[in-house]
């Protein structure tokens, strides 16, 4: 339960006023519920003409408050009966009973209503915390986690926390209040009978706790299967073209069926165990009622009766009212472990360490004036495999640098170090003589623009995709950027122009159009440093020409670092950096490297065959 209280402290604390309101409403509801049951005693006495006892008024503050209230209430009722007759008083008591029940149910509704903002607020806060954490984590974290698993945690696991934990908050606020108030009244009515009843409470709690512990372990396993399901759905949506091309529908369907069947089997066991909460608590409660009926009957039938029949019936009515709060607590005891299991999976994200640490006192870097310098940079992934080894490189401002090499040479890793998507294992990277680890990532990345081989667009309008990351961009600025990127003409041909939604990942556009939107976005940002990842590699000839024209304009006014897969595109580079197995093996202009007859020439000749 320690973990549960930590969750409440973490997420429910901002909603203290709602919790306080719920507590007040539940107390009022319980008090008026006791009043409604207390009215049963005089009603039963009138109906069955029971109780020859004569009540005398006790001055206030002369005895125990409970005794004063009870005695004087019966005194006034007996006086009214003498004056108005039992029939009229019975009608009055029944009307009062209805009014009390109306007040009680209104308080009950109020208690439930003030809990709604807590439930919805906790879920919203939790999702925002996970989402913000995802945005802050380095790229290395996501290379180790499946996207489907992350989606499952932000959707299914958070939903399970809502169903299993936040839904129990109301039970945990309301039911202890009801139980405490009811028990207090029961002790005042007959402490012997109540003490006898409490003896059975530890047995009920022990049975429910044993089932709850087993339920948590099974819930963790069930949520893992849910993650596997979401991961396969994500893979299927991303690879649908390949699945159809290779006639793999049946194979993927069988794989999905196996995962969902395993999840169904595990969920069956969890649901069956959770379903046992109600009948188990019902059985234990009924056994307790039966035993209390027997013991209470002996108290009434004994020579020295400590409770009369109408009071005993009211006692049993209140006691039976405790059964429902106890059953609710038992459901909470079964539900909380499921939520804790999901919370453990959520905490894998929330507690993940961000190794791209922000400096405590960041140095200012608002512009780029001199050079980018890599000093003896080495880098290894967490697996231990070294990707870069002792790389040193200086890129003066305004230079166009191309990085080439075979697949796996470390080209992409090298450029990912500059915006601090990763930090080098050894060595340092400096911009204008300032170590980039001493600069806030926000200031650093504001200086850098990216155009990737596979343009990353969002399910939004063309305008919003171009203006992405540029606060307050105007239509005039967006149009100007689109014209430079050779994108304006095809945009205005769309039915809604710049307000056209381009679909998921820009599926409504061609490859060349997507790339030109990506270039327009970089132009609008207008960064002094540009990183290109072979932006024309997958385009047809016409699209490549238009994209290359846009890139030429973009590159002419800034420092450019481009990864080149096709060596024919690097002829204009001021310097070509040739990499092999994580090291710089050659550098120079195209003609110089060809004349050198080394590794670059070998790569070039392989592509021109």
Segments (PLM) and residue ranges:
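Short intracellular "coupling" helices and adjacent cytoplasmic loop segments at the cytosolic face
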Residues: 48-52, 120, 128-152, 156-158, ...
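Transmembrane helices of ABC transporter permease
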Residues: 21-28, 170-221, 294-307, 324
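ABC-type nucleotide-binding domain
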Residues: 358-359, 365-609
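Hydrophobic alpha-helical transmembrane segments of ABC transporter permease domains
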Residues: 24, 75, 85, 107, ...
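Juxtamembrane helix-loop junctions of ABC transporter transmembrane domains
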Residues: 32-41, 91, 96-147, 151, ...
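An intracellular "coupling" helix at the cytosolic face of ABC transporter transmembrane type-1 domains
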Residues: 13-17, 139-140, 156-165, 169, ...
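Helix-loop-helix
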Residues: 185-199, 273-344, 349-350
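Membrane-integrated ABC transporters
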Residues: 1-38, 47-97, 103, 110-115, ...
């Amino acid at each position: 339960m320690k973990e549960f209280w930590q969750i409440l402290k973490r997420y429910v604390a901002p909603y203290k006023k709602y919790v306080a309101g719920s507590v007040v409403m539940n107390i009022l509801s319980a008090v008026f519920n006791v009043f409604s049951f207390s009215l049963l005693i005089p009603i039963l006495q009138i109906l069955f003409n029971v109780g020859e006892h004569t009540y005398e008024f006790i001055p206030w503050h002369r005895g125990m408050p409970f005794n004063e209230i009870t005695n004087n209430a019966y005194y006034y009722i007996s006086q009214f009966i003498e004056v108005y007759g039992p029939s009229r008083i019975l009608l009055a008591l029944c009307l009062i009973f209805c009014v009390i029940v109306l007040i009680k149910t209104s308080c009950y509704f109020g208690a439930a209503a003030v809990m709604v903002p807590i439930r919805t607020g906790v879920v919203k806060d939790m999702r925002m915390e996970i989402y913000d954490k995802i945005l802050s984590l380095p790229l290395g974290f996501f290379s180790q986690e499946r996207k489907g698993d992350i989606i499952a945690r932000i959707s299914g696991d958070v939903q399970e926390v809502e169903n299993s934990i936040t839904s129990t908050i109301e039970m945990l606020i309301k039911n202890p209040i009801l139980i405490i108030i009811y028990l207090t009244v029961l002790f005042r009515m007959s402490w012997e009978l109540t003490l006898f009843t409490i003896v059975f409470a530890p047995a009920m709690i022990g049975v429910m706790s044993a089932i709850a512990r087993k339920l948590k372990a099974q819930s963790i396993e069930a949520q893992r299967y849910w993650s596997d399901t979401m991961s396969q759905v994500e893979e299927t949506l991303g690879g649908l073209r390949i699945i159809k091309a290779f006639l793999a529908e049946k194979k993927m369907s069988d794989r999905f069926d196996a995962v969902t069947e395993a999840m169904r089997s595990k969920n069956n066991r969890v649901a069956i165990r959770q379903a046992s909460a109600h009948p188990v608590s019902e059985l234990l409660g009924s056994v307790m009622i039966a035993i209390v009926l027997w013991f209470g009957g002996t108290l009434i039938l004994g020579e020295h009766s400590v409770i009369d029949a109408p009071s005993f019936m009211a006692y049993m009515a209140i006691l039976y009212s405790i059964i429902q709060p106890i059953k609710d607590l038992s459901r909470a005891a079964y539900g909380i472990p499921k939520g804790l299991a999901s919370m453990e999976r959520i905490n894998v994200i929330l507690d993940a360490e961000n190794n791209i640490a922000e400096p405590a006192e960041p140095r200012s870097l608002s512009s780029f004036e001199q050079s980018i310098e890599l000093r003896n940079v080495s880098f290894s992934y967490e697996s231990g495999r070294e990707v870069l080894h002792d790389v040193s490189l200086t890129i003066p401002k305004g230079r166009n640098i191309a990085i080439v090499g075979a697949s796996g040479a470390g080209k992409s890793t090298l450029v990912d170090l500059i915006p601090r998507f990763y930090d080098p294992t050894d060595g340092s990277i400096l911009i204008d003589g300032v170590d980039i680890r001493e600069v806030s990532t926000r200031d650093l990345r504001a200086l850098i623009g990216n155009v990737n081989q596979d343009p990353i667009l969002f399910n939004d309008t063309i305008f919003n995709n171009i203006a992405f990351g540029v606060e307050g961009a105007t239509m005039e600025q967006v149009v100007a950027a689109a014209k430079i990127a050779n994108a304006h003409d095809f945009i205005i041909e769309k039915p809604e122009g710049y307000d056209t939604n381009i679909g998921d990942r820009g599926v409504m556009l061609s490859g060349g159009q997507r790339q030109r939107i990506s270039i327009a976005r970089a132009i609008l940002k207008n960064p002094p440093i540009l990183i290109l990842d072979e932006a024309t590699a997958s385009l047809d000839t016409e699209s490549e020409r238009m994209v290359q024209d846009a890139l030429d304009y973009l590159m002419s006014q800034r420092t450019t670092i481009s990864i080149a897969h096709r060596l024919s595109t690097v002829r204009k580079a001021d310097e070509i950096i040739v990499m092999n197995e994580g090291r710089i093996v050659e550098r120079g202009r195209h003609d110089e490297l060809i004349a050198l007859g080394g590794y670059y020439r070998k790569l070039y000749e392989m592509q021109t065959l």
